[in-house]
Amino acid sequence: MNLSQQNQHSNPITEAAKATFPYSVPMIAGFLFLGIAYGIYMKALGFGFLYPTLMALLIYAGSVEFIAAGALIAPFSPISVLLITLMISARQIFYGISMLEKYGIHIGKKRWYLITTLVDESFSLNYMAKIPPHLDKGWYMFFVSLYLHIYWVLGAAMGNLFGTVLPFNLKGVEFSMTALFLVIFAENWLKGKSHESSLLGLGIALVFLLIIGKEYFLIPTLIGIWLILTMRITKLETKLESLK
């Protein structure tokens, strides 16, 4: 084996890229399916190939991208979008705290990309990863996040192209965002041992809907849910602990 072959064999970037691909493969189906749904949804709203592709590349936040898509065709309401995004993505704060050590300054500039691409799946894979000692941990986590990012962007691009090339009937596909949130709510309901916070959210939304009307109830509802849950967080945590 000559010197160049030895250098190539010992290249930490190449080794990490090869090792992480099989680890990320189980996520392909989910990322591509949701990405394709997002691309088709964007097509139904009248946006071309570049919009979903660039939004998937730069926003990279699943359900937030569906919100952004709807916001692009809705009356300008940045406060509503901001509040919804904060509520949906608040869990990222806890992901970030959990990954402080793994994503520390010791891995160099790669940490900025890792922080930017910290989504549910990359958190799960990188947090639970049993990285072989001969691999560079920073590059390993970097490529896990990169592959997931690529799967999502490809899915969004493919979905929009399919919406253009194939004779899909896209009427009603805009309901997919509503369906997405219904599925998330149902999943949390089934997994949760206590439904108090979910019932509070539904109750507050219903009250404001009846009082203010459907045109303006969203922002008061979000603020109300945040205030009530903040005031009751200690009681809710105690109740959850007793159910474990």
UniProtKB/Swiss-Prot annotation:
Superkingdom to which the source organism belongs: Bacteria
Subcellular localization(s) per the UniProt record: Cell membrane
Keywords in alphabetical order: Cell membrane, Membrane, Transmembrane, Transmembrane helix, Transport
A Pfam family this chain is assigned to: AzlC
Transmembrane domains' residue ranges: 21-41, 44-64, 66-86, 139-159, 165-185, 199-219
Gene Ontology, cellular component aspect: plasma membrane
One biological process term in Gene Ontology: L-valine transmembrane transport
Keyword Cell membrane in record: yes
Main location: membrane
UniProt membrane topology term: Multi-pass membrane protein
Signal sequence region: none
InterPro entries associated with the record: Brnchd-chn_aa_trnsp_AzlC, Brnchd-chn_aa_trnsp_permease
NCBIfam families, per the entry: azlC
Annotated family: Belongs to the AzlC family.
Protein name as it appears in the record: Uncharacterized membrane protein HI_1738
